[in-house]
Amino acid sequence: MSIRVLMGNIIGLLLLQGRMSGLNIDNKILSIYFHNPCRRVFEECIKYLKDRKYKFLSIDELYSIISKREQVSGNHVFISLDDAWRGNLSNVIPFVERNKIPITIFTPVQPLNDGVLWLKWFRDEELIDKCSDEYPELKRRVPKSLLTAVRNNIWNKLRDLKSYPREIMTEAEIQKLSESPFITIEGHTMTHPILTKCDEWDLEYELNVSKEKLEALLGSPVSYMAYPNGDYNDNIVEACQRYNYKMAFTTEQRMIDVPSDNLYKLPRQCVPNGYGKYESLARMLGLWNKMLRV
């Protein structure tokens, strides 16, 4: 165990012990998300929640509570995973189904075919060096700062030059997961862009065309979505409403406030990989970020 992990565990344990002194959770819902968690991190987090009698909410149950502004008392949690990482099939799904835990997987459509997210190409330094004369903006700008139309032009070139081992689930795997009573597949755009960098045409493609394609794949409605990287603005919220999403999620690090939160700006607290048990739990509960803001 590294010094960093050890110190994080000590701080996390102290934060968890301090939390026991009392916390008003009435009308609050813990909203957490993972990407590609290792089995240990995911299982430790869920076991912690189970031991403390959290009620695990499906996304439909969450929508019903928030849309009706129902009174909520006691511990409630909503769990989601972003991007449909293939590692979820071995590290998450078996545990979820054994323990009957409802989860939502926010799934971008294009990576189901490509096998990886677009950033895989843009973070390949050897590949970028080969293309830097033709696309000098790759050397000057962070990929996420590129307009989506510019990104797409470069991406089409990079995709012809190199392929990678699959990291994201296949269409068939997503279809099979959607048959589980504990797993809901929902929208995460077409290509996982920075939505605030999209023009109106790209926005329609990312939010509406992706929704139609995912619905066709699943044979069922797609009613909810998560903003890639948590980026959104009022124009994107309006587009989600226009394309008949009922609810959308950000990456704002806090609990859901049932009486007041906007259905299209719901927070989620990230549980990243690479940390020890107690730091992971403190991050899941939002205690770590609260400490950093002090």
Where are these regions (language model features)?
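C-terminal active-site subregion of NodB/CE4 polysaccharide deacetylases
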Residues: 1-80, 86-87, 179-180, 190, ...
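Alpha-helical segments flanking ligand/cofactor-binding loops in enzyme cores
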Residues: 94, 175, 237-238
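Metal-dependent polysaccharide deacetylase catalytic core of the NodB/CE4 family, i.e.
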Residues: 32-35, 75-76, 97-231, 263-266
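Electropositive, surface-exposed helix/loop patches at the edges of structured domains
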Residues: 89-102, 140-148, 282-294
